[in-house]
Amino acid sequence: RNAITWYILFNLLGLGLGIYIAYAVKKPYFSLIFIYCIFSLWAYSKRMKTSFLLGNVQVSFLTALAIFNVALFDMIPNGINKTNNEFMIFKIILCYTAFAFIITFIREIIKDMEDMEGDQKINANTLAIKYGIEKTRKIIVFLILIPVFGIAYFQYNALISNFFVELNYSMENLITVLYISLIQFLLIILLVKMNKSNKKSDFYFSSSLCKVIMIVGILSIPLFTYLQLN
């Protein structure tokens, strides 16, 4: 009963703050986003959690939306000028949004593999139950390769433009490349681990590693901002 009370209070608080922000940016219809989030989380707990992929996609989308809201509320209402740094910042936010979605999606599927025994008891229709551990593991390996190659593409462009064309060997650029390499290294560890995971403990480790990757990725936002401003 106490949990339900707190659930309602926090939902009302979040909705109230969301409506306030929507009116502050003079886009009152943006408040529908927060209504959608509340309804989606309720629907997830009732039905989506046991449905095939729908719950995984929903949680991933809501996680990514939390990052995209920065652009949605701060940049889009004023218009994005393609002739200055605003458009570049918008593209960076889109990259972070995509990163949050794919890592959360991977983690949600791994959690389903970890909880497979319990999900079978409640007749859940998860990817792991429908296709088995072996096929699901191959799907996850493929999904991990998406951010790995995405980061590799960014590293290539950063190295070519900053170090070989502009000959800009600044500490800021070096730290940026090294930090991104750390994220890629963690993704490769996840890739190797998932390629041979079979036990519940393996899936627990991989799920926890996804959390670490997400945290390291999010921490890069204030770090890169500080490096650019100083």
What are these regions (language model features)?
Residues R1-I35, N123-N162:
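Multi-pass membrane catalytic core of lipid/isoprenoid biosynthesis enzymes
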Residues R1-I8, W42-L62, K121-K138, V192-V216:
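Interhelical loop and helix-boundary elements at the membrane-water interface
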Residues R1-I80:
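Intramembrane alpha-helical segments
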Residues N2-W6, F10, Y29-I33, L54-V59, ...:
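Alpha-helical transmembrane segments of integral membrane proteins
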Residues N11-Y20, C37-I38, I67, I144-A152, ...:
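Hydrophobic core of alpha-helical transmembrane segments in multi-pass integral membrane proteins
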Residues G16-S31, N69-C95, Y153-M171, T225-N230:
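Helix-coil boundary and interhelical linker segments in multi-pass alpha-helical membrane proteins
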Residues S45, K135, Y156-N230:
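Extended hydrophobic alpha-helices typical of membrane-associated regions
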Residues V59-K111, M116, E134-L145:
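Functional transmembrane core segments of multi-pass inner-membrane proteins
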